[in-house]
Curated annotation (Swiss-Prot):
Principal place of residence: endoplasmic reticulum
Record GO biological process: lipid biosynthetic process; protein N-linked glycosylation
Official protein name in the record: Dolichyldiphosphatase 1
Pathway: Protein modification; protein glycosylation
Native organism taxonomy: Eukaryota, Metazoa, Chordata, Craniata, Vertebrata
Keywords: Endoplasmic reticulum, Hydrolase, Membrane, Transmembrane, Transmembrane helix
Xref: PANTHER family: DOLICHYLDIPHOSPHATASE 1, PALMITOYL-PROTEIN THIOESTERASE/DOLICHYLDIPHOSPHATASE 1
GO CC annotations, alphabetized: endoplasmic reticulum membrane
Amino acid sequence: MAADGQCSLPASWRPVTLTHVEYPAGDLSGHLLAYLSLGPVFVIVGFVTLIIFKRELHTISFLGGLALNEGVNWLIKNVIQEPRPCGGPHTAVGTKYGMPSSHSQFMWFFSVYSFLFLYLRMHQTNNARFLDLLWRHVLSLGLLAAAFLVSYSRVYLLYHTWSQVLYGGIAGGLMAVAWFIFTQEVLTPLFPRIAAWPISEFFLIRDTSLIPNVLWFEYTVTRAEARNRQRKLGTKLQ
């Protein structure tokens, strides 16, 4: 809180552009799309939460791929140097260049990689039931819809042109395929060794790459352990 007599303003103020999205005043569609365009921020928050509570190497690798994807986007933008549409009506943006769209590239990387993970990484389970397959299909459609809506929001809100979000989506999809192959062929064989490092054991970092359906595995193990402890507690009370 500023004290009396300390309200002299600096020469200029700069906003935090990470979550700063502008939309036309009174435009309900633009208001909704402005929130949807924050999809990458929500994804990052989700990843940080998963890593803190799960500490799984594949999740950490996935986040590393997203970070690399952002670095590639920054490099391409500064090489091509194509301006944003309409003379750049938004002043609070991270960079004045718009080719390719970082939001589009981020979301399509996330969606394509998740799609590959669901259908290739989790295909090993032999007891896939109808509901399991339905869950994968619905989740995949949701991921693709989210990527499209975020890309569309950047065009609607005049942050990018259609070509900028299109090439961003292509770049993100290609990066996702490349990183998925690299993770499966190079990193995954190293995960057991990395998980055995003393520092990994100290931070409880684990490798679940050999478990085809982690969700089902955690459910069954937790249920079995809970029943076992309940029986022991019942025996003590008798």
